[in-house]
């Protein structure tokens, strides 16, 4: 049974519950039930917990008891609810008799904001209980997503407040509030700032209630954004100041705004405007004939999804557009659908198929290999990716194929199976898919492919087909043999290389081909196991306290320790506003082996003794004799949850007071080291990740000096009171900061790895400093003044795609290597790439490549077509290598072999395996390759040239018959619409260009083509799909699991039609004269100009610890001649409600039928690098005009909660010379606006609608009709053109 969560495409699904039933369901779920939770971790046994729905926040929570919530998920993130034991979490306990729940008592919730969803696997006490949860949650899912924005804000505010107010006391401290605002991307400069903005404090404790918090939020949002250039704001703000609730926007004023500024034709109907306002506000006190907005509510509306720039009317499928042949559509297509991550070690998963199909994907791939018991398995052959059963995949496809869309699904079969297993495949196709499987043509007499409407709810097989009358035979393949295809590798897997600095062994991915050994940069040895990382066992529970921030060790002798503790607590609590119960623990000065708990209460520091004693040889800790703990950590943890009780008070331990000087004993800290001395030390450690921290001369200032990308860099750290600041990231201490960046990248991909001091230099330092790490020179010993810097030619690697804006610029893709770079001032460099010499490119789009290490003899000449692609670190020529096993092992590794090259004196590479068997197999195969390299390559080419096909499988192929691409057949009678061809992106690039693009488009008008990523994209990255789309390729297959720009463009393309997976290509592309790369060939299309101002944003996501400094990049992507991008300035330290200065951006578009408007929000970090925050991408033809919200999505194209931009956008047709037509949409809209203004001015003066006001109303009506006629005529001339000011219904 398919899960619920997405309505069936044909309207089927559970019937909607009645209002009374909904009320009963919500009450029952709010009370909650006890259910058994099955974990995804192998180490955790199933547990019974209380599950409840928190209606105020729209969350599911679970806990052992009533006091503490252990976990929660947002209902808005739920994608699907499945009845039964339909997750792997249940499978782990199949052999355990204690956990064999009835199928009917179980259900699974799938949720998340990424491609790979998380699971909540539950066992209820009865089938009725399961039905209650599924029915209730299904209703709540839809209701939560459809809720008006003010209600969503209310739920979000309560969620933030309750995350701090865990005891539900309806109060939080000012320190909690400051931390909370930081978490939502708003910088609070100091506590005074908060106190000035909060009113009605409870003076006794200084706590803040939810009402005060909500009012503060409303005030912060409005006061920060009242300066935006918006209708109503300028005059009303002058009148009301900081009090937006003193100014009301009436129904009539709001109606005029919708008509005059937004071009909303439906707003002519006053009753519709009234109905909209009531549904948006949902305020019982304003359910009156003349509802109104307060000024801040109007601004909230402008940022809301109800005011989206996207015309939601286009979300519906238009059946009339589904009658063309399949070859006239773009079809949403997935590559290696079964993978959840990279191409060499990730997990193959049934869930990946379900997820893709539910995202509207209509062409999925099955990579089939011979498996056990005569049935194929699916995985990425000859790699470490896990395997799934072919039969299980078919059942998953059957369940999910037509949930999101009823239009046909194409199964692209990559067949590596024997004849016998092919026959079993065919049998299972028929058995499992039944009537949905297409086995005969829709119309034998047709001269083209059938339409999506003709193939509704059908599944098509794409597979090679035999000639008529053959039982089986060898057929030619359309794919050339390549030893660089990882599927053709002789062996691949994880081996280990020793780090020459710390002598630890780190995993690398190795690939052995018929002539070479390739190995990757450091990778993860995890082979895609679905389990979460197992928690590490503590070395000893009695020592757990030593790493806690509240433990300060010995603070001083005698009473000094007491005085120091009192000073630390007093300074911390006064400066930060920390609440009562803030505490630290120190070693007792008086009683050896005991400790002292010092805490803050009512403005004073108090102390109590923590006793210790030995009990049967193990220490015990207690405050009172009747409650004893096994460790100091357990005691403190207990009193953080349960109050300390005495005659005078009850109080929980609340906030730990961090150590301020713990860094002084760390190996990386240097109290008196100059910048020059630090650089000299780091020059002797030629490894990225080497670092130290030094005290600077300025007060309360430090610096981290580190190596990254072969260079030495520095960044400042500032102590501000009790907080340590790195850029705009806050930490409690230097120790916390360093600990964080040992786990997370500090600069690009570099993590702090090797702490450097004199002792470390003696062990790992080189004799000669690497001066090239400090200056741009490459000659050791070459030393120059830092300013001016000499220019040296080097190589750089592209961080992003770049398309030339002028003839003297380079065009390149991400990861391209640009050679002979000459650095120039002004942010532009020159270099060689793609056969072009010394052209310009922006320097911030690239990073300089590090000098090749001595351990990589061929690093300078890396093969860009290697099977490891961008992951490649080194490559060795096997015939030139000698292999020797090291029987004694090396540095705690038992299974080690060495690779040496006689041609390179004194060079060898030590490689470790996980087992003796693995070592022997690698050594054996490498030696075999060394002896037979040339013969093996020839044999591989011969074997791949022809392939045997089973008749039973061939008979299932009706329309999608892959054949080698023959350019000579295009446009001739030999071209058959049932034949199709597949291309790796590298081969497709030979046809999607100015020379052959028009010819390839001609091919695609009749036949299907499928394009897929090149095999070297082992990181599952994607290519740019735009050139393939504009040349008519229908099946542009992408890695759906990868959150990159190509997938975001793919999601945008299929927005129209509600992600049904089929989008009709513009009629222009079916014009024989149309050339995809020549704008002069456009006929029947008017060019248009888009004018955009970015005004502000709300609720931007965070990226790491700091407050973001956002800027917005606006891009038009489409035909090559239309693509361009511009960007705003960045706003300092504000991701909650930033505002940008008014600056119009203009984009001229010649082909608006194939154009996308893309917004990307980046933050600029302390190194001036740009980091992705959010994005939104739309087809230009679906945009609305006026003051519009741009709802933002994450990199997986999932909606971010409440995140949006506010823009002012206008779209108008333009002649070639840029002049406006006198009857253009803009001119007509201006006339309509003038008529609207006159009408409202008359009504405002007189207050009634009498005969003498008939003329202004008639002028308004006529202008609106002219505007509508203008669009109708344009729609007739060019179907589905960009609407300038169409019926923009909310």
Swiss-Prot record:
Chief place where the protein resides: other
Stated consequence of mutating residue 842 to L: Inhibits interaction with AGAP2
UniProt source species: Rattus norvegicus (Rat)
Post-translational modification summary for this protein: Ubiquitinated by CBLB in activated T-cells.
GO cellular component, one term: plasma membrane
Domain EF-hand: 152-187
Function: Mediates the production of the second messenger molecules diacylglycerol (DAG) and inositol 1,4,5-trisphosphate (IP3). Plays an important role in the regulation of intracellular signaling cascades. Becomes activated in response to ligand-mediated activation of receptor-type tyrosine kinases, such as PDGFRA, PDGFRB, EGFR, FGFR1, FGFR2, FGFR3 and FGFR4. Plays a role in actin reorganization and cell migration.
Oligomeric and partner information: Interacts with AGAP2 via its SH3 domain. Interacts (via SH2 domain) with RET. Interacts with FLT1 (tyrosine-phosphorylated). Interacts (via SH2 domain) with FGFR1, FGFR2, FGFR3 and FGFR4 (phosphorylated). Interacts with LAT (phosphorylated) upon TCR activation. Interacts (via SH3 domain) with the Pro-rich domain of TNK1. Associates with BLNK, VAV1, GRB2 and NCK1 in a B-cell antigen receptor-dependent fashion. Interacts with CBLB in activated T-cells; which inhibits phosphorylation. Interacts with SHB. Interacts (via SH3 domain) with the Arg/Gly-rich-flanked Pro-rich domains of KHDRBS1/SAM68.
Domain SH2: 550-657, 668-756
Reaction(s) the record says it catalyses: a 1,2-diacyl-sn-glycero-3-phospho-(1D-myo-inositol-4,5-bisphosphate) + H2O = 1D-myo-inositol 1,4,5-trisphosphate + a 1,2-diacyl-sn-glycerol + H(+); a 1,2-diacyl-sn-glycero-3-phospho-(1D-myo-inositol) + H2O = 1D-myo-inositol 1-phosphate + a 1,2-diacyl-sn-glycerol + H(+)
Domain PI-PLC Y-box: from-to ranges: 953-1070
Residues in PH domain copies: 27-142, 489-523, 895-931
Positions bearing N-acetylalanine: 2
EC annotation from Swiss-Prot or TrEMBL: 3.1.4.11
Protein name per its UniProtKB record: 1-phosphatidylinositol 4,5-bisphosphate phosphodiesterase gamma-1
UniProt-listed Gene3D superfamilies: C2 domain, EF-hand, Phosphatidylinositol (PI) phosphodiesterase, Pleckstrin-homology domain (PH domain)/Phosphotyrosine-binding domain (PTB), SH2 domain, SH3 Domains
UniProt remark on domains: The SH3 domain mediates interaction with CLNK. The SH3 domain also mediates interaction with RALGPS1.
Residue(s) carrying Phosphoserine: 1221, 1227, 1233, 1248, 1263
Regulation of its function: Activated by phosphorylation on tyrosine residues.
Active site: 335, 380
